[in-house]
Swiss-Prot record:
Residues 1-33 form a transit peptide. GTP binds at residues 84-91, 150-154, 204-207. This is Translation factor GUF1, mitochondrial. It is found in: Mitochondrion inner membrane.
Length: 674
């Protein structure tokens, strides 16, 4: 027998949802002003992880979670990532998916996957992260285990991107409805496409006034050859239509292929250093099971480790009894040296690796941008050395060695994957450790080919062959990159001129149907690291986007340019440039450096030299002291005698005098805004 209150609620539900049930014109009585309208019943939302932990307790929560995951077959696993340009809403969309699956509470924390402060402030991803989600399909009631692998989007971190994609079966291709397809989206699309990932196009930010959904869909079709009917228009900010994404992931992205009964094989996706537990590895378990106490063997270093803990990120580290094939999870291997964690390495179980081949695609990341780093105050060297060593623990791709400069004292030679990587490292050093650092002008790895066939890579201008060694050199080579730029049509001419002035070679010009142009240029890496992106943004009023990839080495006519003050080379300001721009660069250097030197009692010559030949010069006139101010106007002989004595004194001072250049002068000169 139905209770009266149940019948009443059913009627209210039917009346309030008359459009859904086909009663479009069903009349309803207007409520009187004295009556308050009934509040709509909100649909039940999944209980968040924090609520479950509080209600069940930590141990019971973990036990129930393990039991639930153990019942999910690998056919119900889905591993995916999000491909997006900077500021297209990747982190916001990730938060909405986590809220939808109950991993976090709505509005509890933004940008869950961006762990570093610099990631939150810049809106970029530097370290690959993952989070696991549990989703129950309403129609069948089946549980699904979803692994969202958050990847860096910038080319500087391409090694992490490719390893992350290798652990996924598909990706969400995120496009901003107001901006359309951008360069970074194009570059990462082709990388994902080359790795056979199933792509689901998502049109984001449809709530904006400038949103143009048909144009964005057309771009997706023309640029990526994807069916616009498959596009899901959403607003990650408001959550509109986000609930349609997970069913699409389950339907379109294939489950990972693996067998937990086979011997263990795990791919290292990324790693970081935790001050309490040491190295934490993010791995994709391809085959087998992995649990605490397992002895791991690295395929590339041949070193062994005892596993201290395994688990999933839910959203933070949640220990599990074991992890198995198909999962993307974390492992604490008891590794003491973080530099042994090689991204792309394969791990086996010790004693069960015979006949097993490492997973393909491993490559050691090669630094492409090198800078000299020095403390702004020499006394801070030991403190800053500890800070840099600690930061390098979390970033194994940084090349580090100590060096000494005659001008700036003791410091370090740092190698980075790119200019953004260097900028992020410097920012983290300053904000996390309060360090004040001077970075020299960036240089790239040049190749010297000798006449006897030997080759040598140099990353420091001091290693450039001197005049005595020139006869042994056959030729020099410098690295090039293939750039991809997207920009509005009206700026095409300006950007082409910019590329030409930076020794660029045009490869392709494609006019898109949406008022945008896609340009491909081969540009020397040395030109790219000299704030090429800043100049590109400046000449397009911020509307251009840029991405690039390695294009190998090419023969080049490069020279070493020295900046000398009174004949003494300043090693901190020595650089390698192309011969065609050496004179212009030399003139720029001497003119700029003159601004930061103080007047002396003797004349100071600032020169730019190439092969001991002066190509540019600026002079700081001597500071004049009036030695005749106390003389009578008629005493001409005494007047001339004092001036001659002053002249001789200045001549002698110039011969033996030395100019002291403070660190503040070098720091001001090396700042990008100068």
């Amino acid at each position: 027998m139905l209770r009266p209150w149940f019948c009443f609620r059913s009627c209210v539900s039917l009346l309030s949802n008359r459009r859904q049930y086909g009663f479009r014109y069903l009349a309803t009585a207007e409520p009187s002003k004295s009556e308050k309208p009934a509040k709509p019943v909100k649909p039940a939302k999944p209980m968040s992880v924090q609520e479950k932990k509080m209600r069940l307790g930590q141990d019971q929560f973990r036990k129930e979670l393990e039991e639930r995951i153990s019942k999910i077959p690998i056919q119900n696993y889905r591993n995916f990532s999000i491909v997006a340009h900077v500021d297209h809403g990747k982190s916001t969309l990730s938060d909405r998916l986590l809220e939808l699956t109950g991993v976090i509470e709505p509005g509890s924390k933004s940008q869950v996957l961006d762990k570093l402060d610099v990631e939150r402030e810049r809106g970029i991803t530097v370290k690959a992260q993952t989070v696991s989600m549990l989703y129950t399909e309403p129609a069948s009631g089946q549980d699904y285990l979803l692994h969202l692998v958050d990847t860096p989007g910038h080319v500087d971190f391409r090694a992490e991107v490719s390893r992350s994609y290798a652990s996924c079966g598909g990706a969400l291709l995120l496009v901003d409805a107001s901006q359309g397809v951008q360069a970074q989206t194009v570059a990462n699309f082709f990388l994902a496409y080359s790795m056979d990932l199933k792509l689901i196009p998502i049109i984001n930010k449809i709530d904006l006034d400038l949103a143009n959904i048909p144009r964005a869909m057309e771009q997706v079709e023309t640029t990526f050859e994807l069916d616009p009917a498959d596009c899901i228009p959403v607003s990650a900010k408001t959550g509109l239509n986000v609930e349609k994404i997970i069913p699409s992931i389950i339907k379109n992205i294939p489950a990972p292929v693996g067998d937990e009964s086979r011997p263990l094989k795990a791919l290292l996706v990324d790693s970081w250093h935790d001050p309490y537990v040491g190295v934490v590895m993010l791995v994709h378990v391809v085959d087998g099971k992995l649990k605490k106490g397992t002895k791991l063997l690295s395929a590339h270093t041949n070193k062994t480790y005892d596993v201290k803990e395994v688990g999933i990120m839910y959203p933070d580290r949640t220990p599990m009894e074991y992890i198995k094939a198909g999962q993307v999870a974390y492992v604490i291997p008891g590794m003491k040296n973080p530099r042994e964690a090689l991204v792309g390495d394969t791990f086996f179980q010790l004693g069960k690796s015979e006949g097993l081949d490492p997973l393909p695609g491993f490559e050691e990341p090669q630094p492409m941008v090198f800078v000299g780093a020095f403390p702004s105050e020499g006394k801070d060297f030991s403190i800053m050395d500890d800070s840099i060593q600690n930061l390098v623990l979390n970033d194994r791709s940084v090349h580090l060695e100590k060096e000494t400069s005659n001008a700036l004292g003791s410091g370090w030679r740092l190698g980075f994957l790119g200019s953004l990587h260097a900028s992020v490292f410097k920012e983290r050093l300053e904000k996390e450790y309060g360090a004040k650092i001077i970075l020299t002008a960036p240089t790239v790895p040049y190749k010297i080919v000798f006449k006897n066939g030997d080759e040598k890579i140099i990353t420091n201008p001091d290693e450039f062959p001197d005049n005595k060694m020139h006869n042994l050199v056959s030729h020099y080579m410098e690295p090039y990159v293939e750039t991809i730029m997207t920009l509005p049509n009206e700026y095409v001419g300006t950007v082409m001129q910019l590329c030409l002035s930076n020794r660029g070679e045009q490869k392709e010009v494609e006019y898109l149907n949406t008022g945008q142009t896609l340009l491909r240029y081969d540009i020397p890496m040395a030109q790219l690291v000299e704030d090429f992106f800043g100049k590109l943004k400046g000449c397009t009023k911020g509307y251009a986007s840029l991405d690039y990839e390695d294009a190998g080495y090419r023969k080049s006519d490069i020279v070493k340019m020295e900046l000398c003050v009174n004949g003494e080379p300043q090693d901190a300001l020595t650089t390698i440039v192309h011969k065609s721009i050496a004179q212009a660069k030399g003139k720029e250097y001497v003119t700029r450096f003159k601004k930061f030197l103080r007047y002396q009692l003797f004349e100071v010559a600032i020169q730019a030299r190439v092969n001991n030949k002066v190509i540019a010069r600026e002079t700081i006139k001597a500071k004049r002291k009036d030695v005749t101010q106390k003389l009578h106007a008629a005493d001409i002989s005494r007047y001339k005698k004092l001036l001659e004595r002053q002249k001789e004194g200045k001549k002698q001072m110039k011969a033996v005098g030395r100019i002291n250049i403070g660190n503040d002068a070098y720091q001001a000169f090396l700042r990008r805004d100068n």
